[in-house]
């Protein structure tokens, strides 16, 4: 019987162990998509206690707590941090079988070095004091943890109207050698159907100093913000797409009419929504190309399902789930519309429903080219899929329908400074899969060849892709 989460956790073959320990383990982390607050990096936040760094804003843990019957007061309510922490300690033993159980223990091991005890009510007080003592030390500040975890770059997620003042402050600080770059997230612009669209355009108009009455005005305002983001080191644009729409792009006069209807709070037809979003996205893609940005699309979530809790807590509080809309055809047409004028940028497609894995893995092959290795990527298992089975499925299906060797690898997609251990989880799963191929005679026992492939997937490919 193997020990629980020992140094060879998830590694069952000799080849897998060699690939992980000699090639994957010590590669730096290139975390090209996350939701860290750049202010916390700029100000080098020192966390007061373990609950603050561990439970604050982590909707994965919040969902587990609710499922275990913990009152909301002890999750997002006014209970003390220690009370919330104890509720988490009681919940974790109930999570066996869920990746949260593994993540929790990985997060205690790195960076805190706690390897000799399980997280449960019996050990909770000891772990609390031990970790809190470390959290008061400079090397366990926000920046300190990033450095301990060997992070080289993080790409945050930022609205076009964000000031990016904290990115600028980090960039100007020569004492800190980790790149923290913004990523453009224009969801509130291309989703004309959102109730807050008009209010958002007022904000965009103010920050860009452009009156927005026409489609040309909107592009002018966005162009100013694109240039500003580019000057701040932006390398990527991300798009949350609950629905993938496509319609032939009409004349600009039609787009002006659609925009005017929306500004006057008149209801739009679904066709008009699709025409507008297609026009904006295709134009944005051409601008990304000019700046050599990567375009990311996160497809298929159903957000804010629980209207009562949304009213209480707002978005990103643990009430989202997997959607099941069919979108292969509109996605194909949208990418093709971008590609027709050779204005399809490097692109990463993520699907939330694993049903769509093979569809996405085959779709990316339609638009490869331009002498760019892995120009169009099937993104790593996202959200509900960034667990063992989900990662294995994505890796296997990418390898079967594409080129695994060109994959840009893992990302945290997280708001937590402790989530870098997800890269370790991914790397172990990757090495186990490839090591298994060798043991079964399905891949050559050429460690130098496979080791380079592992190093590329863990770091080198992403570094080269996000230039």
Swiss-Prot record:
- What are the annotated disulfide bridges? none
Q: Which SUPFAM superfamilies match?
A: Metallo-dependent hydrolases (SSF51556)
Q: Spell out the PANTHER family in the cross-references.
A: URONATE ISOMERASE (PTHR30068:SF4)
> In its keyword annotation, does this UniProt entry include GTP-binding?
no
One Pfam entry name: UxaC
InterPro entries under this entry?
A: Metal_Hydrolase, Uronate_isomerase
EC assignment: 5.3.1.12
NCBIfam families in the cross-refs: PRK02925.1
GO biological process: one example: D-galacturonate catabolic process
Q: Which UniProt keywords apply?
A: Isomerase
Q: Return the broad EC class.
A: isomerase
Name it.
Uronate isomerase
Q: Does the keyword Transit peptide apply?
A: no
| Top-level taxon of origin | Bacteria
Catalysed transformations (reactions) = D-glucuronate = D-fructuronate; aldehydo-D-galacturonate = keto-D-tagaturonate
Record Gene3D superfamilies: Metal-dependent hydrolases, uronate isomerase, domain 2, chain A
Q: Which family is annotated? A: Belongs to the metallo-dependent hydrolases superfamily. Uronate isomerase family.
